[in-house]
Structures are given as C-alpha cells and as structure tokens.
Amino acid sequence: MQKDTKKSATVRAKPIDLATCVEASLHTSLDGFDLPRARLYGVSIVNANGVASHEDGALRISFLAEHGDVYELLDAPSSAIARMFDAAVVLTCGWAAPISRQVDDDHETTDDEVPPSQHPQRRRVRLVVVVCDDGVASVLRFADTPDDIVTDAGSARGSLADAVNNLWCDPKVVVSRESLD
C-alpha cells in the first residue's frame, strides 16, 4: 500500500500556531526587549503537525533583513523575498502603554497625547507578527512578565497590520525602462 504523500504535503499550520512557535523559538535566542532594529524573517514549515506543540525542527527560521524603522523594512523592495517562504515574520521591540478612554457629551475619545515611551504606565514589549497565505497572527511578550504571552489570531488593526498584509499580499510591480522599449 502506498502512502498518500499528496495529502500529507497539504497539511498546513494555523497562523496563530506559527506565531507562537516562532515567538517561542526567538524568545530563547534573543537577549531582552531592546532590539534597536526591526527584523524580518522567512519561515519554512518542515513539519506542520509539530508546529502547534512547538516541536524542535518543525520550522526553519531564516533571518532576512533588519532596519531601524519597521515600516521602511516592510516597504523595501528587497523584503519581497519573504514571500518565497511559507510565512514571513516581523519582530520589533518598543514601548506599550494603556489607552485611556474618556466619554464627553456621549462621545468616546482616546487620550493619545502622551507617547507610549513617556507614559507613566509604559511597559517594554516585543512583538512577533506572522503572515502567511492563511492569515496573520501575533504574539506580544512584555519585559516585566517575560513568562507570559498575549496572542492575537488576526484581529489586529492599524498601520502595522496594514504594512504586514501589504508585504505578503501586494507584490511590488517594477517596470524597467528596457521593458518599455
């Protein structure tokens, strides 16, 4: 009896499982929460069944690039190489602070006048975002509670979420002058 290799080749890992597996691996190799530059990695899935249990060897994580500005990193044409992998990973560190909400005249507003880095309740954070054909997921880890993670299975919104989606889904079209002739 022959093994159905086609079926086993189509087993896919969920984005949230990829994110937690990648983050756990990077957490063991990174020093602290103060990386000065955002990093881009490519991930090859070696064993999709081992991703959810964080099995050693389930993923191959390849460093691709880094930049002082996460948005410039994601927008760089050279970052498109990440799409050659099963998933792309963005890792960045920074400050997080609570968003205070106020209700004035039946309208809810947020007080974002104080940057997170200057907020009295600021916390150092490391963010890992994974994007693949099946979606986006992210994992946060705070310096003051390094044994705990906060996960998001794809509901994040905002400029970083848009930039990550654009990296994966919006290939850059480059037309050279020679092709116009």
Q: Where do the PLM segments sit?
A:
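Eukaryotic short linear interaction motifs
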Residues: 49-52, 99, 137-138
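Short HxH-centered metal-ligating active-site micro-motif
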Residues: 68-108
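Short N-terminal edge-element motif at the start of the domain
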Residues: 1-34
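Hydrophobic side chains in beta-strands
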Residues: 43-44, 92, 131-132
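Short, surface-exposed beta-edge/turn micro-motifs
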Residues: 36-41, 85-87, 123-127
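Glycine-rich, aromatic-bearing surface loops/beta-hairpins
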Residues: 103-181
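Compact, glycine/acidic-enriched structural inserts
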Residues: 4, 9, 59-64, 151-163
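N-terminal interaction modules that seed assembly of large macromolecular complexes
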Residues: 24-74
